[in-house]
């Protein structure tokens, strides 16, 4: 809408014939940020993080000591961005608002808009996970979060297996089981298995019923038999309306 907000544009607010004019009565969407991100204060324009790789195996001693040491890993630069917005309201509209609350509520809408903006940006971890997203983070590895091209800074480490975290299969019992296995077999920068067990399944709202069927069915999943569903209760399901793709899913 044009700014400033004028009495001509909001004529209904000045008309005493209206008994009620509603304003954003929908329940606010849940805040997913604490589930996905750590939150810290900062006094710098950007924050930089790095790590060092694990070391390799200890060889059998044959009379000469073998030396090893870690390598420097990848750097991540977090750039803080400033957001600002305002609302201009015509004095006549403010003075003559017959509802007594709608104009005042417009100021609260700024806060709700800020909250929505934060949630949309937080959802980039999913919506931009298949491309190199540098809006807030710059990673020296230079590949997408979900990629079959992940590398390591440690020389001599094969990335042929355990570095690919990109899948393309539609959500199903078979693909979810395969994703869990692949997750557990992911390797660190030294090429050693991490063996972390995924316990969350993130889906768009389009897949939330299918996700519940996969995780909450006790027996007979996609079968006429009474076979136990080994995925039952294995994960917490998070469905989020901010995830824009209708078919993608993440563990």
What positions do the PLM features span?
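Long, contiguous amphipathic alpha-helices that act as assembly "spine/axial" helices in icosahedral shell
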Residues: 74-133, 201
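Charged, low-complexity, helix-prone segments enriched in Lys/Glu/Asp/Gln
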Residues: 19-21, 26, 40-41, 110, ...
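Assembly/oligomerization interface modules of large self-assembling protein complexes
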Residues: 23-83
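Generic detector of short, locally flexible boundary/turn motifs and exposed helical patches
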Residues: 10-12, 49-55, 75-77, 161-169
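Solvent-exposed, flexible loop/coil residues
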Residues: 53, 65, 93, 97-98, ...
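Sequence/fold signature of self-assembling virion shell proteins
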Residues: 2-5, 142-251
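Signature of extracytoplasmic/envelope-associated structural regions
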Residues: 43, 54-59, 77, 109-138, ...
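N-terminal alpha-helical "arm" segments
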Residues: 1-27
């Amino acid at each position: 809408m044009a700014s400033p907000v004028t009495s001509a544009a909001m004529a209904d607010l000045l008309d005493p014939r209206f008994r009620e004019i509603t304003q954003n009565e929908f329940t606010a969407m849940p805040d997913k940020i604490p589930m996905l991100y750590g939150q810290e204060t900062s006094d710098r324009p950007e924050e930089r993080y790095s790590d060092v790789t694990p070391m390799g195996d200890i060889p059998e001693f044959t009379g000469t000591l073998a030396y090893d040491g870690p390598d420097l890993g990848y750097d991540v630069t977090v750039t803080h961005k400033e957001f600002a917005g305002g609302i201009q309201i015509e004095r006549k509209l403010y003075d003559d608002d017959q509802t007594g609350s709608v104009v005042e509520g417009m100021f609260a809408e700024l806060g709700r808009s800020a909250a929505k903006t934060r949630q949309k940006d937080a959802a980039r971890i999913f919506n931009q996970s298949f491309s190199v997203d540098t809006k807030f983070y710059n990673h020296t590895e230079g590949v997408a979060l979900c990629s079959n091209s992940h590398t390591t800074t440690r020389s001599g480490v094969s990335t042929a297996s355990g570095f690919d975290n990109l899948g393309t299969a539609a959500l199903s019992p078979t693909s979810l089981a395969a994703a869990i296995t692949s997750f557990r077999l992911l390797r660190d920068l030294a090429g050693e298995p991490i063996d972390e067990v995924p316990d969350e399944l993130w889906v768009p709202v389009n897949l939330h019923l299918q996700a519940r069927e996969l995780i909450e069915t006790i027996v007979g999943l996609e079968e006429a038999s009474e076979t136990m569903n080994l995925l039952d209760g294995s994960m917490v399901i998070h469905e989020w309306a901010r995830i824009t793709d209708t078919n993608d899913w993440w563990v």
